[in-house]
A protein has these predicted regions:
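Hydrophobic/aromatic residues within well-ordered alpha-helical segments
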Residues: 27, 34, 38, 42, ...
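Residues in soluble alpha-helical coiled-coils and helical-bundle/repeat scaffolds
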Residues: 25-29, 33, 50, 54, ...
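Amphipathic alpha-helical segments used for helix-helix packing
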Residues: 71-95
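A ubiquitous short alpha-helical element
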Residues: 30, 62-69, 95-102
Length: 176
């Protein structure tokens, strides 16, 4: 967890090193607080009229919002990687990540259900499979962009094509 240190948090937040150490008595407490902060920034993105104007367009913007395409998102991705790398060795952190993922998948499943009922999404698309695929794709692309940065103009077509493949529209009945 070299990315999350008392000094780096103090520098980023504008707090004194002593204030950070007093607020977070252990590195584990600091890591958990950093994770909670990162999750809250994603939650704000999720709350902005989810699934609109279409599920497909919204998922594209959601994935792009989580990719390291600028300094702020790159920092968030680095924290995410550092936290997830630590999770197998920290049961409390692992439980927090698992709960967050389950909640996010549940919300994406609800949006998929709404899109199916509104005729936007093929009825055979399973919401859980869609949610897991979108999250796995976003994590994979984010990881690649950390070591091979690209700008949004380069990445957007890839995200659009992948989300389109994961969200097929209902097929039209044959003409008679």
């Amino acid at each position: 967890m070299s990315a999350v240190t008392f000094r780096s948090v103090a520098a980023e937040s504008g707090w004194s090193l002593g204030a950070v150490q007093k607020t977070f008595p252990t590195k584990e407490a600091l890591v958990r607080a950093t994770l909670a902060y990162a999750q809250s920034s994603i939650a704000v993105r999720l709350s902005a009229d989810p699934g609109r104007p279409t599920l497909r367009a919204w998922l594209v913007e959601l994935v792009l919002a989580t990719l390291p395409l600028d300094d702020a998102r790159r920092s968030a991705c680095l924290i995410g990687v550092a936290v997830s790398d630590r999770a197998p060795f920290d049961p409390e952190l692992a439980a927090s990540l698992a709960a967050w993922d389950a909640d996010l998948r549940g919300k994406l499943q609800l949006l998929a259900g709404r899109a199916r009922s509104e005729g936007e999404l093929h009825p055979d698309v399973d919401g859980d499979v869609l949610a897991r695929a979108v999250l796995a794709f976003a994590a994979g692309v984010a990881g690649q962009l950390l070591y091979e940065p690209r700008d949004e103009a380069h990445v957007r077509p890839l995200v659009q094509a992948t989300v389109a493949a994961l969200t097929p529209a209902p097929t039209a009945p044959p003409l008679e």
